[in-house]
Amino acid sequence: MGIIFFSLFEKLLQATGRSLYSTIGQVAGAVVNIILDPIMIYGIGPVPEMGVQGAAYATVIGQVVSAVLLFIFHIKLNKEFEHGAKYMKPDAGIIKEIYAIGLPAIIAQALMSIMVYVMNLILKFSPSAQTAYGLFYKVQQFVLFLAFGLRDAITPIIAFAYGMGSKKRIKDGIKYGLMYTSVLMIFGILITEIFPSSFATLFNAGSSREYFIGAMRIISISFIFAGINVAYQGIYQALDGGMESLIISLLRQLVIILPLAGIFSIFVRKGRAGVSLIWWAFPITELAACLIGFVFLKKIQKIKVERLTH
């Protein structure tokens, strides 16, 4: 239950531009979890040894701590919100608007799991390639979390500007959001391209080391396009473009990447190419989605931004 309220109050604080307090709540829960893990797993002091069950308890307690802290921040700081039982009455119009924007994000999360599962099936012919992909996926998520963070920052800013009817602020939010995201992604590319061996050692790639390094050198090229796609999705959501956000998610994680990787794997299994051919499916997919995303952005700007008067 803690994660439900944690997520709710975290987003309410982010929506009012109080991301610092959102971060404090997250960190507090994580610290409590880290402290309680060894205590409850191995049994320290009056706490009995609980093993894996103890780790689960520590996680739940950490989530509850975060939820309570974020709730306090929300009540004390988010004066923009009015609270009361009368606001608990379901409103079909509001629910529809919430799902119009939120459903694409829900589907995107589900697609991520589906993509990883199917990619592992595609790579089934090579256990080393499977392992390399699994390890690199962790590195990729670490880099893309930078883009996710900026997306969460620019979405409320652009949404505020859109609600105010400020064309200049919307354009500034889009410009700087894309620019800063690109800078961070270029940094991510440089780090992964220059130090692939260090990452292989860090993640204990073992016999999959060469596959891991090969995957990193090729797939990391896609970071710049992937980061921009993530930013695009935040911009679309801020401008009430949930469908465009959903389409980009489908292109990136299902429609292009999986058929392309599947086709490339046929050539690899027949000995006509190396496993590296499959890794090229990632940059190609992100570039294609990025180009389509740019078209969507121009369309949304023309329809929803250019008509604004100030």
Predicted segments — roles?
Residues 20-27, 69-72, 87-118, 123, ...:
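Hydrophobic faces of transmembrane alpha-helices in multi-pass small-molecule transporters and flippases
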Residues 1, 47-102, 158-222, 265-310:
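Short alpha-helical transmembrane segments in multi-pass integral membrane proteins
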Residues 3-22, 132-196, 226-240, 244-245:
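Small-residue-rich hydrophobic transmembrane alpha-helices
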Residues 33-34, 253-259:
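Aromatic-anchored segments of alpha-helical transmembrane domains
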Residues 41-50, 113-137, 142, 160-161, ...:
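Helix-terminus/linker motif at the lipid-water interface of multi-pass membrane proteins
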Residues 1-14, 22-30, 55-70, 151, ...:
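Short runs within selected transmembrane alpha-helices of multi-pass transporters and secretion channels
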Residues 37, 41, 70-74, 120, ...:
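Structural signal for membrane-spanning alpha-helices in multi-pass inner-membrane proteins
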Residues 30, 109-117, 129, 133, ...:
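Recurrent gating helices in multi-pass secondary carriers
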